């Protein structure tokens, strides 16, 4: 496990999340941190390459927190940024390609086939991470979007339902209790 790279990425992502290009607020770092945590958990559960999943999880949204103008295609730009960073850190070229594919295919809103278990782990970790960051979603709804209490609650509830529905069948089964427990807040 390249702990040196993982530690570097934690700092790099934190710094970028504090920069002027990040228009998603402080919750962006916590989202990425939760993706890395869930990615590691899923990689262990499903037998994926943990190192690739963890590194890809830390890098999956790097483009969108670096420059808001890259957001729409952040999965493509992020793969390029990841390659640049990981090459400088002398990471294995074959693993760089796996990381890039995980980043390119992580978005649930962009229908792309997940060809490897690592890609599925990162995509599922991204979707389920919203359940670890409900306060950030509420902040987004109420503070950043200026929604009423009812509108904000519906926004967050629907976001969580969409996120859960993006999961692979294996991850849905694995996270059923987390989903049900979180949904109790909205009854």
Residue ranges of predicted features:
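His-Asp-centered metal-binding catalytic motifs of divalent-metal-dependent phosphohydrolases/nucleases
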Residues: 50-68, 74-78, 98-107
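Divalent metal-dependent phosphate-bond-processing catalytic cores, especially two-metal-ion Mg2+/Mn2+ enzymes
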Residues: 2-4, 21-47, 59, 110-187
